[in-house]
Curated annotation (Swiss-Prot):
Induction: By bacterial infection. This is Apidaecin P. The lineage of its organism: Eukaryota, Metazoa, Ecdysozoa, Arthropoda, Hexapoda. Antimicrobial peptide active against many Gram-negative enterobacterial and plant-associated bacterial species. Not active against other bacterial species like H.pylori, P.mirabilis, B.pertussis or N.gonorrhoeae. Signal peptide: none annotated. Belongs to the apidaecin family.
Amino acid sequence: NRPTYVPPPPRPPHPRL
C-alpha cells in the first residue's frame, strides 16, 4: 500500500508587465 503522489496543480502563466 503506497501513498498516491499528487503533483501540484500547474501555475497560470505570469502576466507580462
